[in-house]
Amino acid sequence: MYFWRGYYFGKEGIWCQDFDKEEAFCVLKDSLYKDYMVRAVADNGKTIAVSRNIGTNEPLLMVDVDKKTIKNTISNHTFIYPCLDREGSKVFSVTKSDIYKNIYGNPFCVDAETGKVIATLDEKTQWGNTAYHPESNSVYFSAFKQPNLYKFNFDTLAFSAVSTDKKIRIFDCKVACDNKGYYYLGSNILVYMNNEDEEVWRINFKEKEKLSGKTLFSICLSDNPDYIAVYLLDGNWLFIVNRNDFSYKKYKLGRVGFSEFFNNSLLFIYKNDNFSTLNLETLEEKPFLPTAGAIL
């Protein structure tokens, strides 16, 4: 299931494409929400969080996907890389940082119904991405360009630190599609950890590719258990890594907004909300549109 903002079938709004079904459907089609974007999706697929802007204290709207209605609005918080718990009842977020003014915030969790803060990490720094782990109902998150990785459990509301390689300045972290582990990336090194927070393997791209002056900064994981994709900071190259033997293919990419895998392809979202897919076996790229039928 994939959510996006766009103009399709004569309607602009928040759309959903369930890849197990033939039809896309519009979750929010009112013109009032044309500038809103999807910020987080509950693991059960029944709740999404949307807002107008990233990095401001704009209200976060909690949307019931089945009923296509807004069930609650959370105000007075700045949500950066928010994550929803399994049922969409709690929202975790790192906070906005201004490194030039030495202003940093505390990661926190709020009750999605009341908007009340129910957990806070007493540590302030510049925070990186978040990654939801469905099996443990937890969130992994990193301190940006630092060797620090943390875990927040939605059930216990407890924070914990994860032991990592202190020589790696972390850019990104992602949970494996099979929920058997997770990845973190930094200093041009990709590390795979199991659910016991133990390192299983790593790939040092700097040694293999001589990435002088370039930085790998983002990970994208496939529903197919064989593939990982890693981006260069300048957006020009994509490395498609085979999890089984650590071999990889390179693809001349060009800059994209963001992307994710589905089936055996990588779905790109370019500027102006144009879609395309890249086949991981053939490296064939072609335009992508939702199915011809739609439920408005």
Per-region residue spans from a language model:
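A short beta-strand motif characteristic of beta-propeller blades
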Residues: 23-30, 69-74, 116-121, 158-165, ...
